[in-house]
């Protein structure tokens, strides 16, 4: 392997490690912002339902963003580990080449041609990966992380309210919800708490 190829591989390893750290930092930032939105949700629960839902949606988006960032960081770490192995192989091969200049046959038995071919494939794959990682910020977080299910919003609002001994401030929609007759309620429904029933009625 040429010096340029070796330097390129080591540079890719550096870029991968740097990218992984940056993704971890962004994940930590998303985690802090998730907590901030959750705290805002706690304060708004008994004041305004619409605002509460906005804070709940924001918290869920930040949670999804954090998970996406951590998954991507894990993938980058995995590839960096393979690059590190490739760099080590190159260093070992170079050392042996300097020490055993006259041992051509021994080196041939190590199948250096195959090692070179594998390294060439490694470099090409990692150059492509490096390009993909560099455009990450232009792409933004995976679109799935930006979608928030209304059921998850309701679930988070209910959870926060329960944890803080609060009762959700309901909208005027509840005034028009028909009263559920006892005979229409099955055993499982009777076991559900009142807050969950109100949330279902609100979504209806």
UniProtKB/Swiss-Prot annotation:
Q: Report which residue ranges the record marks as coiled coil.
A: 9-56, 109-129
Question: Keywords assigned by UniProt?
Answer: Coiled coil, Endosome, Membrane, Phosphoprotein, Protein transport, Transport
Name the gene.
DID2
Provide the residue span(s) of the region labelled Interaction with VSP4: 104-204
- GO CC annotation: cytoplasm; ESCRT III complex; late endosome; multivesicular body
Assembly notes: Self-associates. Interacts with VPS4 and VTA1. Interacts with IST1.
Enumerate the residue ranges of region (Interaction with VTA1): 176-204
Which family, according to UniProt? Belongs to the SNF7 family.
**What membrane topology term does the record carry?**
Peripheral membrane protein
Q: Which GO terms describe its biological process?
A: endosome transport via multivesicular body sorting pathway; ESCRT III complex assembly; late endosome to vacuole transport; late endosome to vacuole transport via multivesicular body sorting pathway; protein targeting to vacuole; protein transport
Q: Which residues carry this modification: Phosphoserine?
A: 5
This one is known as Vacuolar protein-sorting-associated protein 46
Give the residue ranges for region: Interaction with VSP24. 1-103
Instruction: Cite the Pfam families for this sequence.
Output: Snf7
Q: Where is this region: Disordered?
A: 185-204
């Amino acid at each position: 392997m040429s010096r340029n190829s070796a330097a390129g591989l080591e540079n890719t390893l550096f870029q991968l490690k740097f990218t992984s750290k940056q993704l971890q930092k962004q994940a930590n930032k998303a985690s802090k912002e998730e907590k901030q939105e959750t705290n805002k949700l706690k304060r708004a629960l008994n004041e305004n339902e619409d605002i509460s839902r906005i804070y709940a949606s924001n918290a869920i988006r930040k949670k999804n963003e954090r998970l996406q960032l951590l998954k991507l960081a894990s993938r980058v770490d995995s590839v960096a580990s393979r690059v590190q192995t490739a760099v080590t192989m190159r260093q070992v091969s170079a050392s042996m080449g300097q020490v055993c200049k006259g041992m051509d046959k021994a080196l041939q038995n190590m199948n250096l041609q195959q090692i070179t071919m594998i390294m060439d494939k490694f470099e090409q794959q990692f150059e492509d990966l490096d390009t993909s990682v560099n455009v990450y910020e232009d792409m933004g977080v995976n679109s799935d992380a930006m979608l928030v299910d209304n059921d998850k919003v309701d679930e988070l609002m209910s959870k926060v309210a329960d944890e803080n001994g609060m009762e959700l401030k309901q909208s005027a929609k509840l005034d028009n919800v028909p009263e559920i007759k006892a005979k229409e309620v099955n055993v499982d429904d009777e076991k559900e708490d009142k807050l969950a029933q109100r949330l279902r009625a609100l979504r209806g």
